[in-house]
Regions:
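Divalent metal-dependent catalytic cores for phosphoryl transfer on phosphate-bearing substrates
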Residues: 47-164
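Metal-dependent nucleotide-binding catalytic modules
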Residues: 1-3, 17, 132-192
Length: 192
């Protein structure tokens, strides 16, 4: 997996501008859904805002699929039978920029899908085709032991909430605020 096509060496020095540059360059890509990466990010954040989530959850929702834009595996790696581990890739690149209350839900939103499939077997039936396909690559529903451990995570509730908004944020042509409107909120959580 290579990040070279993003031309990181030419990205702005400012962390938020780097994030926006990645969205500008790769946000129009699709990942097996009927919305682009950018549309999905904005919708997921919008649903979190509508449901009264904390600002940290809103930022996590906005950035949760950042890792999808960082790999060069194509727009839907799951179709090729590949788990891109986008949740780990995104959280790793954002590490050092944001606190754990944002990074952990990003890192764990795939685990939250697996957890919800364990907790509510009917949940899997409501997943999009792309999410069901990737679920198989990501390990399927959690085991009892995995679920017990997952429920003890310090940001467990935020992880599950993000996952639910992630599932909702796939509405073609939904109107949302633009990416730049989140700049003050993102900057507020930067650790540098």
């Amino acid at each position: 997996m290579t990040l070279s096509n993003l031309r990181f060496q030419t990205l702005p020095a400012d962390a938020v501008e780097r994030i926006f540059a990645v969205f500008d360059e790769r946000g129009s890509r699709h990942y097996g859904e009927n919305v682009s990466e950018l549309e999905h990010a904005l919708q997921t954040a919008e649903f979190a805002r509508q449901f009264g989530e904390s600002d940290a959850v809103i930022v996590a929702c906005l950035l949760h699929d950042f890792g999808h834009m960082l790999h060069d595996l194509g727009e839907d790696a799951a179709l090729q039978g590949v788990d891109a581990k986008h949740e780990e890739l995104g959280a790793e690149l954002l590490r050092g920029l944001f606190p754990e209350e944002i990074l952990d839900p990003i890192r764990q939103h795939v685990a939250a899908k697996r957890y919800l499939c364990w907790k509510q077997p009917q949940y899997a039936a409501g997943l999009s085709e792309s999410s069901r396909r990737s679920l198989a690559l990501q390990g399927g529903p959690m085991t009892d032991a995995e679920a017990d451990a997952f429920q003890l995570r310090p940001h467990f509730a935020a992880c599950v909430s993000l996952r639910r908004y992630d599932d909702m944020g796939k509405v073609p042509q939904m109107q949302t605020a633009d990416l730049r409107s989140y700049e003050p909120l993102i900057r507020r959580f930067l650790v540098h």
